[in-house]
């Protein structure tokens, strides 16, 4: 039995009685977006429970509040599917599609899920902007861009919060992941994440793609 299913069988007391999604999670947001936000993996009692990426946990609240303040979401909260949240010009995805033990997917899991991330990127404009949340998501984005034929910088870029790379027709921006480990310690603050997202929106506008003005949930 997979971890996503085991987590659903023995949830914390506050979630007992809920029906868990407990399946791979798709991306969420504006399918005509010019910004692709890439996290690591669904949380066992967040997205794995609610059926929507970055939904139902503190990491999601932190992310979507920043997206709301950057003009990419219509509300600051992400509680459950059907809560009215809509994204404008942004699609939120993840490097791994199933909740992993300890929030740490194995390399093989990341390799297996890369095709889904590549497919999502292929549906977006040729100059779509990528925002990687954390080092593993950053690495996944680099591998996907290489897979699509983009020439990789040499030496290979290393993750750093606030980094902005030009790879092929894309801009790749990096941010610390909005995990509680980072947000509770102040390693990542709301202004820090908001600054990265605002920069992503500016980069998207440079492409001349009007998708950042459209809203879709």
Question: What kind of feature is each model-predicted range?
Answer:
Residues 216-217:
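A cross-taxon signal for low-complexity, glycine/charged-rich
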Residues 210-212:
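N-terminal basic, low-structured, amphipathic or hydrophobic segments
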Residues 1-159, 163-205:
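A polyanion-binding, active-site-adjacent surface
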């Amino acid at each position: 039995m997979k971890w996503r299913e085991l987590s659903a069988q023995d949830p914390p007391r506050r979630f007992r009685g809920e029906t868990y999604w407990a399946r791979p999670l798709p991306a969420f947001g504006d399918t005509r977006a010019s910004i692709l936000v890439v996290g690591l993996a669904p949380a066992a009692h967040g997205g794995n429970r609610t059926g929507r990426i970055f939904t139902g946990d503190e990491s999601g609240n932190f992310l979507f509040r920043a997206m709301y303040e950057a003009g990419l979401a219509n509300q600051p909260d992400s509680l459950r599917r059907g809560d009215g949240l809509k994204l404008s010009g942004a699609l939120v995805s993840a490097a791994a599609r199933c909740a992993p033990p300890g929030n740490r997917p194995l390399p093989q899991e990341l390799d297996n899920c890369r095709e889904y991330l590549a497919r999502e990127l292929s549906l977006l404009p040729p100059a779509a902007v990528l925002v990687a949340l954390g080092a593993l998501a950053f690495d996944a984005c680099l591998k996907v861009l290489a897979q699509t034929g983009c020439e990789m910088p040499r030496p290979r870029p290393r993750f750093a919060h606030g980094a902005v790379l030009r790879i092929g027709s894309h801009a790749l921006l990096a941010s610390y992941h909005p995990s509680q480990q980072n947000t509770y310690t102040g390693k990542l603050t709301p202004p820090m994440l908001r600054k990265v997202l605002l920069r992503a929106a500016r980069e998207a506008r440079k492409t001349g793609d009007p998708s950042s003005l459209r809203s879709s949930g």
